[in-house]
């Protein structure tokens, strides 16, 4: 049995704990089979509420409340209606669970509190989490508790819990047992006020007032005052005193109409203050309490209390669950709190706490209808705190609402606030782990600078800065996030000073973000918040690039978190689909602008193009789009007409003079040069088209000054232009490399088979030519590896070069060629050189497979072969297990005494492998066919005689081995190959288009001439670099900088297309079946509310009719009295009509109904 700490009023007054001198506390064990236990504290009615609240939080370790619901109702046995029982058992407990609320109720097992205790018990039994629990605190006066003597003796047994008998149904007069379903009890002792109930009420009011002045950080980074709501269910007339005093303390009340008792009295009279007279109140009390007899003095006193309560209509919310039961109780509670905060000032600050509460409860519908209904003018600065809460707690609907209501993200998002958002990352998330890793790396770097700096490092939880965020993004996006979250002044300087080791160039945290929507989008993507990220994507610019960047981030994070790889892959597909759909919208509107969108450098993503981002993200579906393929086809053919027959190209190869004939069709010449003033204002469609359709060097030629007339004649310009157009097209470069590579393989074959002479006769002339040819291949590989991108470090260039599998193949082929040539020059290892070169020829020949990628049918087969090789690699693990198991066993059975290593290797690995294909050595297994020798001289070169002792076991193992390998494992391999083929072949078109892009990009960047003539192209590149001439005209086909006016025009056009796409998506969502059903249900709710309003209007109209009828009756009586000749008649009828008239008058005053005419 668990012990407890108890203290009583005998302790010294200077105890450290604030409540020690005045509080007695302990534990209660309730009898019965449930083994329930609760904590209690005995307090005087004069105890400070702060001490009691501190005890609840500090000693009892209750979670700080986000809401306090004080339940007020009947403390006598009562019959509970079914709907009211559901409201208490389901609605109240659900609201407390979802909002983290405390329920203050009576501690006695009687009346309303009994049903609340049963609801708490049912929830505790059904809940599977210890973190989600309902906190119900029972408060009662000690004078009303049954078996009080057990509690009075708590100070005598400090270390043992009190055993309370399980007689919950035993009610002896005013005494009632404690409710065993509750876990915490506050028992109030009678004080100087005399009555225990008066002391209890005083303590309840003071505790509620104190809690309402405390603050909590629920739902975000800000603090709000803890809202306290009193819920009135049923109740007796004495409850009016508590309600009146509570509303004077500005405590909001929710009154459940239809629950009976004083709640129905308030529901009937509080909305009609003109009827709050003693006669009408007496009528209501008699109807609601028919078995009670009240004095006129009590009725008058209660009427005064009703008038005081009705004077605070903004604190009273009447709700009838029978007629308006479509809303949950937490919704009604939030509406009551919002209503209580409304004032005549209409200042936004008066609604902030309720708005924060709506954010914490995720009730955007209430925020729209009750707070953002047009009555309050919200400024952007008013919404900054709640915007932070909505972002941290992942409430995209609220973020959208705040932006629509006037929040300015450009003013809101400073670098300091962005850093604060990254500080709020969940410690269990992958992003937190990555940021912590980068933070630790930075601490180690700083610690290595010196002991003094190491002592200055912060201690405690890591406070991530934007430097760590930029490093994480750098790992995911590489060059696409270059310069993110760094000092802008440093980035703008030309040739900045070298940064000291460990020093961070961070932006000023008070500066506003340069692109707030992009930064918030990245923050949401890194936390895998798709809905939030989608909204930021919709609000930002450069949508295609942003979606592809998110696709890349999700792909990288899925590799780091294998458990959530499937979910992240689905998110990745969604982002890729966003980019694909938006580009489809753009391509359908304008092809030229869509092509420019693919190759323009995006300023928000470090001047990276959409094609580069798609390549990094491995977005195969994006490359398979018709618009992207049309652009690639345009790049592939260059300035030649698409669809030119290959034979004509080969004819131009053999006879270059055919280039200047009409054999091959070329595009029209570039437009005439224009003035710089015209280029700065590309407003006309013709000017824009000339920009978008211009290619590479032509764009620069548009801006060049006119040449001197004698520089080049028109004929020479025509010849030079045609020559460049033909030899500069990627298709020509590809065909040239294919033809020359076949020539290289033919020369290699000739040298190996015919003209490969040993020294000193060799090498021959053809072999020297082969050496020179390979030398030009080496130069081209060096150019591809180290001279492709000037803005990248050499190490990274080499890393990117090695990542390509075909480049690895080239490196192996060149390495083997160098080794083979070196060996063949030495006579002693000439044959070894021949062997290496023969193997190298096989590697060079396999390099031809790369050429097939351009073919639509053969291209996907390359991927199939590559994936099948991976399948074979894993299959070999299974096969090797059986090979080794069977080989070692048979070797031990047949040749136990043969220790020759070469023979052991043959029999353990080689022979079982051959047996898979049917080569079974019967001469070793069958005794009649054994052919061996036992002579020691012959044993060295021949097989040893097998041991036939376990011949039957060897045969059995052979049968088992063949069954498993030939039937089971081979069929497994075939099934794996079949699955791989189906997966790739099912998406063959997408895989081929993705391969086609890589091939086009590769040959687009290659020099025009093929090896060995490529040496001329390399010399030309070197000369252009020496004389500082632009040697990268072709790069502008895939990466282009547009003039600022045209660039802004493209950005605006893309934004418009994104809005069109989003409107189309929204229309599809509205037309979906689920949305139609939701709208129908919403309309039904509106109709129900409207009908409920009609009922209220009907009641008011009846009331007005009754008043009008009564006025007409009085006027008629006055007319009859004052009319001539009516005195006698009136006096004659005075005795018989005066009393009935008075009765009718009182009946009207009580019920509001007109008197009968009969």
From Swiss-Prot:
Keywords: Calcium, Cell membrane, Coiled coil, Ion channel, Ion transport, Ligand-gated ion channel, Membrane, Metal-binding, Phosphoprotein, Receptor, Transmembrane, Transmembrane helix, Transport, Voltage-gated channel. Changing residue 897 to N: Shows normal sensitivity to acid block and significant recovery from acid-enhanced inactivation. Its main location: membrane. GO terms for biological process: monoatomic ion transmembrane transport; positive regulation of insulin secretion involved in cellular response to glucose stimulus. Strongly expressed in liver, heart, testis, brain and kidney. Detected in fetal liver, kidney, spleen, brain, heart and lung, and in adult skin, eyes, spleen, stomach, small intestine, colon, lung, bladder, pancreas and thymus. Biallelically expressed at all stages and tissues examined. Also expressed in subsets of taste receptor cells of the tongue, in olfactory sensory neurons of the main olfactory epithelium and in the vomeronasal organ. It is found in: Cell membrane. Multiple phosphorylation sites regulate the Gq/ TRPM5 modulation axis, with the Ser-129 playing a substantial role in this positive modulation. It is a multi-pass membrane protein. Residues 552-572 form a coiled coil. It catalyses: Na(+)(in) = Na(+)(out); K(+)(in) = K(+)(out). Residues 488-507, 1127-1158 are annotated as: Disordered. Ca(2+)-activated cation channel. Displays voltage dependence modulation. Regulated by PI(4,5)P2 levels. PI(4,5)P 2 reverses the Ca(2+) -induced desensitization of channels. Inhibited by flufenamic acid with an IC(50) of 24.5 uM and spermine with an IC(50) of 37 uM. Is a highly temperature-sensitive, heat activated channel showing a steep increase of inward currents at temperatures between 15 and 35 degrees Celsius. Heat activation is due to a shift of the voltage-dependent activation curve to negative potentials. The channel is blocked by extracellular acidification. Ca(2+) 2 binds at residues 781, 784, 807, 810, 1002. It comes from the Eukaryota. Ca(2+) 1 binds at residues 341, 350, 353-354. The chain crosses the membrane at residues 730-754, 765-784, 806-824, 832-854, 864-893, 951-985. Residues 1127-1141 have a biased composition (Polar residues). Monovalent cation-selective ion channel activated by intracellular Ca(2+) in a voltage- and temperature-dependent manner. Mediates the transport of Na(+), K(+) and Cs(+) ions equally well. Activated directly by increase in intracellular Ca(2+), but is impermeable to it. The activation mechanism of TRPM5 involves a multistep process. This is Transient receptor potential cation channel subfamily M member 5. It comes from Mus musculus (Mouse). The gene is Trpm5.
């Amino acid at each position: 049995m668990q012990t407890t700490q108890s203290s009583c009023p005998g302790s010294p007054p200077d105890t450290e704990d604030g409540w020690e001198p005045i509080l007695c506390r302990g534990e209660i064990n309730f009898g019965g089979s449930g083994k329930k236990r609760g904590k209690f504290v005995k307090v005087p009615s004069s105890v400070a509420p702060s001490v009691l609240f501190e005890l609840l939080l500090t000693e009892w370790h209750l979670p700080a409340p986000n809401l306090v619901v004080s339940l007020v109702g009947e403390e006598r046995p009562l019959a509970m209606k079914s709907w009211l029982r559901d409201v208490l058992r389901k609605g109240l407990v659900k609201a407390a669970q979802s909002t983290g609320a405390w329920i203050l109720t009576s501690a006695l097992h009687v009346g309303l509190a009994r049903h609340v205790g049963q609801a708490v018990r049912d929830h505790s039994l059904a809940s599977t989490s210890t973190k989600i629990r309902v906190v119900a605190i029972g408060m009662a006066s000690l004078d009303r508790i049954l078996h009080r003597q057990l509690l009075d003796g708590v100070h005598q047994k400090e270390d043992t819990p009190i055993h309370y008998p399980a007689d919950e149904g035993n009610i002896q007069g005013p005494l009632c047992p404690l409710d065993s379903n509750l876990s915490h009890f506050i028992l109030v002792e009678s004080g100087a006020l005399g009555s225990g109930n008066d002391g209890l009420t005083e303590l309840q009011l003071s505790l509620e007032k104190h809690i309402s002045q405390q603050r909590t950080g629920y739902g975000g980074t800000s603090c709000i005052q803890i809202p306290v709501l009193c819920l009135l269910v049923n109740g007796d007339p004495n409850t009016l005193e508590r309600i009146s005093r509570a509303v004077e303390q500005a405590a909001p009340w929710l009154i459940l109409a239809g629950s009976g008792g004083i709640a129905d009295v308030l529901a009937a009279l509080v909305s009609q203050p003109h009827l709050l007279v003693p006669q009408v109140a007496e009528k209501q009390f008699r109807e609601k309490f028919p078995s009670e007899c009240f004095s006129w003095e009590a009725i008058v006193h209660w009427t005064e209390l009703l008038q005081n309560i009705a004077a605070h209509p903004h604190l009273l919310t009447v709700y009838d669950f029978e007629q308006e039961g479509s809303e949950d109780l937490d919704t009604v509670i939030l509406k009551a709190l919002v209503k209580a905060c409304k004032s005549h000032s209409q200042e936004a600050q008066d609604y902030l706490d309720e708005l924060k509460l709506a954010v914490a409860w995720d009730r955007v519908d209430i925020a729209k209808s009750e707070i953002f209904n047009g009555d309050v003018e919200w400024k952007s600065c008013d919404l900054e705190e709640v915007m932070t809460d909505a972002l941290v707690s992942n409430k995209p609907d609220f973020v959208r609402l705040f932006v629509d209501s006037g929040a300015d993200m450009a003013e809101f998002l400073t670098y300091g606030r962005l850093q604060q958002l990254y500080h709020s990352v969940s410690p269990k998330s992958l992003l937190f782990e990555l940021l912590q890793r980068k933070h630790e790396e930075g601490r180690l770097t700083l610690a290595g600078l010196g002991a003094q700096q190491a002592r200055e490092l912060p201690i405690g939880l890591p406070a991530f800065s934007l430097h760590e965020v930029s490093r994480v993004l750098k790992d995911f996006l590489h060059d696409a996030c270059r310069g993110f979250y760094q000092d802008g002044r440093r980035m703008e300087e030309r040739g900045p000073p070298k940064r000291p080791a460990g020093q961070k160039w961070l932006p000023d945290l008070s500066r506003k973000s340069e692109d707030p929507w992009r930064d918030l989008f990245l923050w949401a993507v890194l936390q895998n918040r798709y809905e939030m990220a989608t909204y930021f994507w919709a609000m930002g610019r450069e949508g295609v690039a942003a979606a592809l960047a998110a696709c890349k981030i999700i792909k990288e994070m899925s590799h780091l978190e294998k458990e959530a790889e499937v979910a992240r892959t689905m998110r990745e597909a969604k982002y890729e689909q966003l980019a694909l759909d938006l580009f489809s919208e753009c391509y359908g509107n304008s092809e030229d602008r869509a092509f420019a969108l693919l190759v323009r450098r995006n300023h928000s993503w470090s001047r990276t193009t959409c094609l580069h981002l798609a390549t990094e993200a491995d977005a195969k579906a994006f490359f398979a789009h018709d618009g992207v393929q049309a652009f690639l086809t345009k790049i592939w053919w260059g300035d030649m007409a698409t669809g030119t027959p290959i034979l004509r190209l080969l004819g131009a190869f053999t006879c270059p003079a055919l280039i200047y004939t009409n054999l091959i069709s070329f595009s029209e010449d570039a437009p005439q040069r224009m003035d710089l003033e015209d280029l700065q204002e590309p407003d006309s469609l013709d000017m824009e088209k000339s920009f978008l359709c211009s290619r590479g060097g032509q764009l620069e030629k548009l801006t060049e000054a006119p040449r001197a007339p004698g520089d080049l004649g028109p004929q020479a310009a025509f010849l030079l232009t045609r020559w460049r157009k033909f030899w500069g097209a990627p298709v020509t470069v590809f065909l040239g490399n294919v033809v020359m590579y076949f020539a290289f393989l033919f020369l290699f074959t000739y040298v190996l088979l015919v003209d490969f002479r040993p020294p000193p006769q060799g090498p021959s002339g053809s072999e020297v030519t082969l050496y020179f040819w390979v030398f030009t291949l080496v130069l081209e590989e060096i150019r591809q590896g180290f001279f492709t991108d000037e803005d990248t470090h050499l190490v990274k260039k080499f890393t990117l070069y090695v990542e390509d599998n075909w480049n690895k193949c080239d490196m192996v082929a060149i390495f083997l060629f160098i080794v083979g040539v070196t060996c063949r020059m030495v006579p002693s290892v000439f044959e070894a050189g021949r062997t290496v070169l023969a193997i190298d020829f096989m590697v060079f020949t396999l390099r031809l497979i790369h050429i097939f990628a351009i073919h639509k049918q053969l291209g996907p087969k390359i991927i199939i072969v590559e994936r099948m090789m991976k399948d074979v690699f894993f299959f070999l693990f299974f096969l090797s297990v059986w090979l080794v198991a069977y080989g070692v066993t048979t070797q031990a059975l047949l040749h136990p005494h043969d220790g020759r290593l070469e023979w052991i290797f043959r029999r353990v690995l080689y022979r079982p492998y051959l047996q898979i294909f049917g080569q079974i050595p019967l001469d070793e297994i069958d005794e009649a066919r054994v052919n061996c020798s036992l002579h020691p001289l012959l044993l060295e070169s021949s097989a040893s005689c097998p041991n036939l002792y376990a011949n039957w076991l060897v045969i059995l193992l052979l049968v088992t081995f063949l069954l498993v390998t030939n039937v089971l494992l081979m069929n497994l391999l075939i099934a794996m190959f079949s699955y791989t083929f189906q997966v790739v072949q099912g998406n063959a078109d997408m895989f081929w288009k993705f391969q086609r892009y890589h091939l086009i990009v590769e040959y687009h960047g290659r020099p025009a001439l093929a090896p060995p003539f490529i040496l001329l192209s390399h010399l030309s590149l070197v000369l252009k670099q020496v004389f500082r001439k632009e040697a990268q005209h072709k790069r502008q086909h895939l990466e282009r900088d547009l003039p600022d006016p045209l660039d802004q025009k493209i950005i605006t056009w893309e934004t418009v297309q994104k809005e069109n796409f989003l409107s189309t998506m929204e229309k599809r969502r509205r037309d979906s079946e689920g949305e139609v059903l939701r709208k129908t249900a919403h309309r039904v709710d509106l109709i129900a509310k409207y009908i409920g309003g009609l009922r209220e209007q009907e009641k008011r109209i009846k009331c007005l009719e009754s008043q009008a009828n009564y006025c007409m009756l009085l006027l008629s009586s006055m007319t009859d009295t004052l009319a001539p000749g009516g005195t006698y008649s009136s006096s004659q009828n005075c005795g018989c009509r005066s009393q009935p008239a008075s009765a009718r008058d009182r009946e009207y005053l009580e019920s509001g109904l007109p008197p009968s005419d009969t």
